[in-house]
Amino acid sequence: MAVFKLRVLTPEKIFFEGDAEQLIAKTTSGYVGILKGHAPYVASIVPSEMKIRSDGSFRSAAISDGIVKVSEDSMVTVLTSAIEWSDEIDVARAERSKARAEKQLKAETSRTEFDLAERQLKRAVNRISVANKK
């Protein structure tokens, strides 16, 4: 299968950089599959499972909000605030984060605090879901 260059970046690190055969990500308009030669493209990624096919096999990761960009030279870049491989997710920690977010959502808080708790809940639920697909 043909390969393209893929970079997945967070503010803290380069999560993945190398050749990929396919990228599957969930955007605001649904799932997108990217192969070599994909047309230039930009989309917002929602918290979900992202799959990278490299060396003939898929590897899954839990990704937070982000952006995927396919440039004219077929370079694919994913920018996200947080991402982790499914086999590296600390499920107990994610469960604690979920419980904290649910508690915060039930409390009387400002709209900003509510929105933050809602995002934290979505991220925790996504991490748990992706980890349990191993």
Swiss-Prot record:
It is found in: Cell membrane. It comes from Ruminococcus albus (strain ATCC 27210 / DSM 20455 / JCM 14654 / NCDO 2250 / 7). NCBIfam families: ATP_synt_epsi. Produces ATP from ADP in the presence of a proton gradient across the membrane. Keywords: ATP synthesis, Cell membrane, CF(1), Hydrogen ion transport, Ion transport, Membrane, Transport. One of its GO terms (cellular component) is proton-transporting ATP synthase complex. Belongs to the ATPase epsilon chain family. SUPFAM superfamilies: Epsilon subunit of F1F0-ATP synthase C-terminal domain, Epsilon subunit of F1F0-ATP synthase N-terminal domain. GO terms for molecular function: ATP binding; proton-transporting ATP synthase activity, rotational mechanism. It is a peripheral membrane protein. Its main location: membrane. This is ATP synthase epsilon chain. The gene is atpC. F-type ATPases have 2 components, CF(1) - the catalytic core - and CF(0) - the membrane proton channel. CF(1) has five subunits: alpha(3), beta(3), gamma(1), delta(1), epsilon(1). CF(0) has three main subunits: a, b and c.
